[in-house]
Amino acid sequence: MSMFLDTAKIQVKAGNGGDGMVAFRREKYVPNGGPWGGDGGRGGNVVFVVDEGLRTLMDFRYNRHFKAQSGEKGMTKGMHGRGAEDLIVRVPQGTTVRDAETGKVLTDLVENGQEFIVARGGRGGRGNIRFATPKNPAPEISENGEPGQERELLLELKVLADVGLVGFPSVGKSTLLSVITAAKPKIGAYHFTTIVPNLGMVRTHSGESFAVADLPGLIEGASQGVGLGTQFLRHIERTRVILHVIDMSASEGRDPYEDYLAINKELESYNLRLMERPQIIVANKMDMPDSAENLKIFKEKLAANYDEFAELPQIFPISSLTKQGLATLLDATAELLDKTPEFLLYDESEMEEEAYYGFDEEAPAFEISRDDDATWVLSGDKLEKLFSMTNFDRDEAVMKFARQLRGMGVDEALRDRGAKDGDLVRIGKFEFEFVD
């Protein structure tokens, strides 16, 4: 099980359209009374709505299936069936929605009240009024409702924080958060004390405020899933400014500069765009005996190995214990936030404008295969949609479906594959004989 409650896989099913109706008026001089069957109602959509009051995806652990209502059937007197209400599913602010099958990002839900249709309801089937023609003024034909879209979704929740605290385990991130905000993270002198992100609000002495996330501790190899790994890195993608906290006392026996390089290497390995974010170096534990000398060496190494054309990151010596240097650090952070834009999580070209619910234009209208029992099997989105909307209880509807298959080239394709008169052909669970 994931160490964070920030991912969930769910099933969504939009409502089917209501079936159209076959009905006739009873009027003198009107053939068979004339058609009077109405259309079915639209199936309900499944709609995600951002609720700023939600903080986790915990609810989706216990309720993984969401199904909207179907539209009502068409009625006599040409009346349409009632359309179904949309199913509203509330999600936390900061939820990214992916198609679980393709991994494609469908939407990034960041604004309170933002809505997105994740599954589109099927349209209602047409009643027999719609099929009346001069040649057939009293058609005994109607359509079934279109099936609602069904899909499996992967939800990811990323912490919505302006500033992210990163660094090796036990460098003092949780303590720093506790003294600059009202947050009360778990603090301990052992690695991975923080295994879920802690959030807090900072208010500077000048009245500016911003959100800070103390993110779970990172170790080398995190971008390959080591330790808390990619679960940690997923949470930092949204932050606009990174505070890189380093233990200048070297109390764990590590070189502060090597720590700095290792963390940045992991950030770059996971996603190059993470390194586009401005970074402030927080030299923590400056109240310890060796910290001042270690900071001097750190600055020398940083200057010696930094690109001569690049601007050196700001370094702020602080002590979370004595609160030394905190006010200066927070003012600089607020100033940097003011001039740093938000970073798009994904390229806009990767985002869908709305939920995909039609057919891929490049996909073939149908495919033909053959089972071990020699039955020809027809498949394909377009063909299966036509099949599902055909009312096989009505002879006219069956004949119309046969004409549609011929129009799509199914008969010719079966002949080309070697189908002979009397061979069985299957669509879904429905079988019929091929007539040459």
Swiss-Prot record:
InterPro entries: G_OBG, GTP-bd, GTP-bd_Obg/CgtA, GTP-bd_prot_GTP1/OBG_C_sf, GTP1-OBG_CS, GTP1_OBG_dom, GTP1_OBG_dom_sf, OBG_GTPase. Residues 161-338 form the OBG-type G domain. Mg(2+) binds at S174, T194. Its EC number is 3.6.5.-. PROSITE patterns: G_OBG (PS51710), GTP1_OBG (PS00905), OBG (PS51883), OCT (PS51881). GO terms for biological process: ribosome biogenesis. An essential GTPase which binds GTP, GDP and possibly (p)ppGpp with moderate affinity, with high nucleotide exchange rates and a fairly low GTP hydrolysis rate. Plays a role in control of the cell cycle, stress response, ribosome biogenesis and in those bacteria that undergo differentiation, in morphogenesis control. This is GTPase Obg. It comes from Streptococcus sanguinis (strain SK36). The gene is obg.
